[in-house]
Amino acid sequence: MVLLVEKPDGEEWELEVEKEYEEDLGIEFENGGLMDDYRSCSNKCMFCFIDQMPPGMRDTLYFKDDDSRLSFIQGNYVTLTNMSDHDIDRIIRYHLEPINISIQTMNPELRCKMLHNRFAGDALKKLQKLYDAGITMNGQIVLCKGVNER
């Protein structure tokens, strides 16, 4: 993998990184940088474990991340509902992979119902666009009895 890094003065460095598929990239960001403002989830999933947590825990446990940068860097799963077409194009352009996607169902109407997000069904078009571009994806589902088990 080759990373192109642009320094604040405009100088560009190409860094070659050799790693196994399952290994972390090994990149850490300083405070005040790229990863300060994580994107929070806009869904209200019927199965969300964060919504089911007891009160009184530390605040960081209640943060619902849905950030594609965390998927690529840390292996977090995203629903694609918080990603713009620009975000998808950037993943394709820079070939950022693998991206981990929380799918739940391929039925757009059922996906909207499960995620309580009227735009959740549109994310399947983004999934297809990533597939067509050859982006490696890992998928997961939360199986809800009587809802998405067929």
What does each model-identified segment do?
Residues 2-29:
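PDZ-domain C-terminal substructure recognizer with occasional recognition of PDZ-binding tails
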